Amino acid sequence: MDKLVIFGAGSSILVDLEETCTRLGLDLFAIVNNQDGPSFAIDQEKVIGLADVSDAMLAHPMVFALFTPGHRKFALDQARGLGATRFYSLIDPTAITPSSLKTSEGVFINCAVTIGGMSSLGAFSFINRSASLGHHCTVGEFASIGPGVVTGGFVSVGRGSVIGTGAVILPGVSIGANAVVAAGSVVTRDVGDNCLVMGNPAVVKREGIAGYNEVGV
């Protein structure tokens, strides 16, 4: 495969993408710092700013190292504005994924993830380490699943939503677009669009939020 470009050097989750690339034996062409501020890269020599992005770099496939859906969408828009057209789905070799899994472009699946059969992951979705998704799960575009999340079968997570660390979502539950499930929550019923829920059982704490960190997609 071509060398890979990672967008988002200012995000601390970057190091996990670098480790996945190492486990896969993928070479990095560059790591783009798309915002002012320090870089979290393990390989600092690969870090460049937006002004240094070249046509040669844009010929390589790209992934995005940002957990917040709105930030990931912003970085994607930046990359497309520079002329990027190739977006790679990066799947850690320690993840257990079914042969029936459907993935779109730009997906990241971190280490030790388990996904059940007949599930689908939308474009630019992000599945963080040790999450366990049941069979027939659907994760929408730009949605982010936090570390250690557990879902039952037939769960649906809407576009741009975030499921916090260690949350549990019972079978058949639907999470709306740009919703946020707080860390450690147990979700027993459907969650509407743009809602923040938390607790065991999870209840609505806020409605009309833009999204995670008040940035929607």
Mark where each language-model region is:
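NAD(P)-binding Rossmann-fold cofactor-contacting core
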Residues: 23-40
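Short hydrophobic segments within beta-strands
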Residues: 6-8, 32, 65, 182
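Phosphate-bearing ligand-interacting subdomains
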Residues: 36-96
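Short amphipathic alpha-helical segments
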Residues: 17-19, 74-78, 121, 193, ...
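Short active-site oxyanion
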Residues: 2-5, 28-29, 59-63, 177
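Glycine-rich adenosine-cofactor-binding loop
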Residues: 2-21
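Short, solvent-exposed amphipathic alpha-helical segments in soluble enzyme
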Residues: 20-25, 79-81
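Structural signal for interior beta-strand "rungs" in well-ordered beta-sheet cores
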Residues: 90-198, 202-205
